[in-house]
């Protein structure tokens, strides 16, 4: 995706704390008692409970705040996939002057379905418990990841990368993000968060996404002023599942470029 966008746009990607090449940390600025600029004091009646865990979307948004400040990036569009979309939304709320807009890919929600979420959390925990390092060396294991959560098979290169990312993720971070991002409180907070954002927010949905179905993407998008009456801030990509940036990279890059350059 970056290879397509970097032709005319400056791009920066990073691994979430505890994933990829980012090491899991033991504390955030909030845990250390360092100031966060008071940006959350008036937002959504935010309470300190959001920061009790290192793995809430808000805690990860604080990481992004620190990153942009450290790199002295004063103007940026945030693009996030799935949970990354939620993190981008929170970061936009925390940095209204730095963040010019948000593009969420395969991200939505804002409706807490108790039974469905309990099943998802339980199954997810069991799945994450079986992640031996040797799994990535298992012959043909990547073939399984070419078809998981997608509408069209991925190239084996990307499937292989999915396997590696899966097995190297920090155990605490993997479980923590699963549990802390799917609580009733966290899910129900999303619509109000989106409704209060002043920046433009767009949502790219996969027409065949079974993880985050388009109807749930449209639901969350409907709380933003750009939704209007015709889902003007939602773009549905055909023949696409939950990994739009890998399944339909040209289409996604085209939409991102049009949105960013059109503002």
Tell where the protein language model's regions lie, with residue ranges.
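Gly/Ala-rich beta-loop-alpha elbow adjacent to hydrolase catalytic centers
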Residues: 80-84, 88
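Flexible "cap/lid" loop of the alpha/beta hydrolase fold
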Residues: 93, 101-133
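Aromatic pocket-lining residues of Rossmann-like dinucleotide-binding sites
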Residues: 5, 91-95
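Catalytic histidine-centered segment of alpha/beta-hydrolase-like enzymes
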Residues: 240-249
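Conserved alpha/beta-hydrolase catalytic His-Asp/Glu region
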Residues: 113-116, 135-196
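Active-site loop/oxyanion-hole signature of alpha/beta-hydrolase fold enzymes
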Residues: 3-6, 12-79, 254
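Structural signature of beta-strand start/N-cap positions in the alpha/beta core
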Residues: 8-10, 74-77, 98-101, 200-202
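Conserved loop-alpha-helix segment in the C-terminal half of the alpha/beta-hydrolase fold
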Residues: 3, 196-240
């Amino acid at each position: 995706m970056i290879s397509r966008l970097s032709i005319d746009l400056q791009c920066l990607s990073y691994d979430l704390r505890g994933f990829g090449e980012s090491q899991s940390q033991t504390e955030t600025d909030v845990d250390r008692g360092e100031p966060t600029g008071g940006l959350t004091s008036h937002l959504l009646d935010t309470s300190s409970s959001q920061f009790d865990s290192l793995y809430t979307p808000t805690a990860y948004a604080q990481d992004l705040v620190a990153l942009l400040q450290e790199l002295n990036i004063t103007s940026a569009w945030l693009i996030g996939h799935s949970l990354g979309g939620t993190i981008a939304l929170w970061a936009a709320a925390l940095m209204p002057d730095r963040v010019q807009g948000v593009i969420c890919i395969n991200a939505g929600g804002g409706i807490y379905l108790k039974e469905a979420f309990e099943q998802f959390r339980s199954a997810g925990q069991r799945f994450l418990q079986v992640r031996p390092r040797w799994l990535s060396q298992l012959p043909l294991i990547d073939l399984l990841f070419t078809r998981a959560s997608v509408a069209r098979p991925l190239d084996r290169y990307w499937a292989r990368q999915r396997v590696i990312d899966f097995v190297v993720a920090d155990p605490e971070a993997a479980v923590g993000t699963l549990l802390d991002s799917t609580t009733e409180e966290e899910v129900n907070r999303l619509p109000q968060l989106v409704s209060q954002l002043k920046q433009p927010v767009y949502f790219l949905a996969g027409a065949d996404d079974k993880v985050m179905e388009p109807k749930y993407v449209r639901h969350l998008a409907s709380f933003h002023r750009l939704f209007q009456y015709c889902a003007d801030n939602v773009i549905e990509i055909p023949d696409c599942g939950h990994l739009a940036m890998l399944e339909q990279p040209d289409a996604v890059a085209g939409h991102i470029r049009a949105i960013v350059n059109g503002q």
